[in-house]
Amino acid sequence: MNNSALRAYLSTRAPDQIHSAFVAYLANLDLVAHQFPQIASDIVQELIDQRSYVKLIASENYSSLAVQAAMANLLTDKYAEGFPHHRYYGGCQNVDSIESAAAAEACALFGAEHAYVQPHSGADANLVAFWAILSRQIEMPTLSSLGVTAATHLSEEQWEVLRQKMGNQKLMGLDYFSGGHLTHGYRQNVSGRMFRVVSYAVDRDTGLLDYAAIEAQAKRERPLILLAGYSAYPRSINFRIFREIADKVGAVLMADMAHFAGLVAGGVFTGDEDPVRWSHIVTSTTHKTLRGPRGAFILCKKEFAEAVDKGCPLVLGGPLPHVMAAKAVAFREARNAAFKTYAHAVRDNARALADACIQQGMQLQTGGTDNHLLLLDVRPFGLTGRQAERALIDCGVTLNRNSLPFDPNGAWLTSGLRIGTPAVTSLGMGPEEMKRIARLIARVLGAATPVRTKTGALSKSAAEVPGEVRSSVCSEVRELLARFTLYPELDEPFLRAHFTRRPAGQNTCRRRDLNPYGVTPTDFESVVSASFTTSARAQPITRGTKGTAVHVVFLREAPCLPLREPLFFSHEEF
């Protein structure tokens, strides 16, 4: 399938036409394809797919090729349990250097006193923070009162008393249905099982945080941890007020800025809206508005540094040195002036998109946004969030359904959509494109209708969009994305030619594989055998699988998307 794509590229380009980023990308794929061609093909297909959809998922973005390259090296081979210069393994001097550099970059970027860059995910970071707080606030004072310095010195009876004490503390975070995250105390998550959770909610009428009500609840409950942050709240947070509340009740203020870390780093949220300034501990992911690798980190005041650095063995095992290297690169990138421009553009685009949605007659939770996301109520369209999500994906727009406050449709079907601007802003889109996207969303949702199940009842999960609407919207999506190319350094036709041809025996796909492309049975123009010579409208195919009845499907008009190669179906599947 592949006889050194890198060699082919270098042999056909003049020196001034060679792009170093593409060379690095090709070299990586060449190595992968030599061992496992399908994986290289799937990586290229993911690039094709991401270039084919307008990405409005608020928790996703596009990392730089430099960030990606920092992860593809031998650092992945190294165990480095512990923290810099205090490891459980020898020979970690280079990992010490990398982790220390990443932590220093994070501190400089956010103005933090201490940074811990080992967590693999936001959930991991929150667990480390929770246990660091429990350790410093509950465990260490208890050990001191017993005249010992470590839990290993306790008797079985003493340890059980301490364990029960640590497991009976209160966590007060934003309710899941008000926009809080699963890890903020949701009962189906470990956080809801390791604490006595006393969640606060947004105001039922305004959808906004009511700081007076939160203070009254905190005084009544007196939690160990007051947690501020969100995954689906479209407004900014006053962290100064949260800190004042925490101080009044003796709580530790923890902030989860996973969604808006890039807005903090870029100077969009400053003063009272800066969680790092006011919180004792701050957790975050690196891959959302911060545009880094998939991972997380923790920032904290000096008094919590020792407890946080014990994330291993408290919660984590070995860190991922190659990802910590990529985090360092991302933090350095975010310290550039260009990132500040980007961060402000993210919010400007979110506000422009919100205004345009309202002008299109759509209803937004809280009437707008202060950050990178907005919540759209789809009930006026007669749809559930799940139906709306599927209808838009079928038309080339990716986003996710989301519960609204006090949502009657629950957490699975939902009544809303969460829409974010980080990724489209990374592509260079601006307010005018946001207006166009709002029109596309309105057109799709206005045309979508629930489908009927086999029993004749209306489905709450599936919806269909008329073919002419889908075709029109997909055409606009293609035109829009053609002007804002993801990773323009990467030559897609070249990658297709060298990596996406399916080897014999692996060129079948199932009907459900077409769902992401918005293809329905009505799109089938004709079905012919692999050896059949057809008319000029459908080019013949020469590939097939040995011993299998394979048919090729020709699409009348591939709705949006990366269906530029024939799609194969086994006879049984078709």
From Swiss-Prot:
Pfam families hit by this protein: SHMT
Residues binding (6S)-5,6,7,8-tetrahydrofolate, per UniProt: 180-182, 306
Gene3D superfamilies for this protein: Aspartate Aminotransferase, domain 1, Type I PLP-dependent aspartate aminotransferase-like (Major domain)
InterPro entries assigned: PyrdxlP-dep_Trfase (IPR015424), PyrdxlP-dep_Trfase_major (IPR015421), PyrdxlP-dep_Trfase_small (IPR015422), Ser_HO-MeTrfase (IPR001085), Ser_HO-MeTrfase-like (IPR049943), Ser_HO-MeTrfase_PLP_BS (IPR019798), SHMT-like_dom (IPR039429)
UniProtKB keywords: Amino-acid biosynthesis, Cytoplasm, One-carbon metabolism, Pyridoxal phosphate, Transferase
EC number: 2.1.2.1
Cited HAMAP family: SHMT (MF_00051)
Stated name of the protein: Serine hydroxymethyltransferase
Species of origin: Treponema pallidum (strain Nichols)
